[in-house]
Amino acid sequence: MGEIVQYLLTGLSLGGIYALVALGFYIMWEATKAANFTHGDVYMVGAVLTVVLVEKGLPVLLAASIAIAAAAVIGALIERLLVRPFNKEPNAIGWMLTTIAAGIMIESMATITYGPLGRPLPSPLAEQPIRFGGAGIYPQEMLLPIVAVAAMFGLEAFYRRTTLGRAMRAVAFNRTAASLMGINPNRIALIAYALAAAIGALAGILIAPVVQAAPAMGALIGLKAFGVAIVAGIANARGVVIVGLCYGVIEKLIEGYISTGARNAVGFTLMILALLLFPQGIFGRREVVKV
């Protein structure tokens, strides 16, 4: 029993990472019908930059705030320089190549300047685990699913109750109509990518005390989070979080009852099967085209 509880707890923690990073893909897709494939590396930048600043003597909260702000700037620059120029036509896909290339460059630069090895981010919440019967989990890990759910509800409130949020929803619904109403879609896209990057960086900072911050920590997380968003139905924030949390639990169960090596293979196989059964995503809606 304790073993199952352990897998559930650590799975929810892992799922919280996927959910937070996948929420970033949701935000970007809603604004531009494109995505930033450097998103996993932005997650890494949040963790790595925070560690570097703390090592320089800054308080953790200040270092984390600077890292999140820097990630937001990176996200905005990526939208302006690597997505917008290559996403002018309805079926344009050039942004895929440019953002993938940028992600490789970011990881390479981080490896050169930071080093390839992981370094810890100190946190009092990662020193003593909380015990639940035969299972244990650090309070730091428990933050991840809590923050993911809070971010989801926060985004929903932001989209519904703020002028900027309603403008972002209008662009997501109909970009042309939003333009005619005086909304600047390019400005909305810039803000969306900055917001997505900030959330991704936050996820990296929250997990850094547990897994250590390293340049290679982001690429696979970003790929899995994108898969989570697609399987959920990328235009559904609640679905993205639910699938993210569930996928984390599934991975830990695979790791525990099959093997660590099988985790990625079986996990991606399940993603493929889910898309075969739900082509629009589990929580997605089939688009109706009127002619």
Residue ranges, per PLM feature:
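Transmembrane alpha-helical segments in multi-pass inner-membrane proteins
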Residues: 18, 58-69, 193-200, 204-205, ...
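Transmembrane alpha-helical segments of polytopic membrane transport and secretion proteins
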Residues: 1-2, 78-88, 280-291
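Membrane-interfacial amphipathic/re-entrant helices at transmembrane-helix boundaries
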Residues: 1-21, 49, 61-63, 89-95, ...
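Transmembrane helix-bundle core of multi-pass membrane transporters
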Residues: 85-86, 91-161, 188, 253, ...
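Cytosolic-side transmembrane-helix boundaries in multi-pass membrane proteins
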Residues: 21, 113, 173-180, 184-187, ...
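Short, non-helical or kinked segments that cap or interrupt transmembrane helices
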Residues: 16, 25-47, 89-94, 164-167, ...
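Membrane-embedded helix boundary and interhelical linker motif in transport proteins
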Residues: 30-77, 81
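Helix-loop-helix "hairpin" substructures at the membrane interface of multi-pass membrane proteins
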Residues: 14-15, 136-214, 237-243
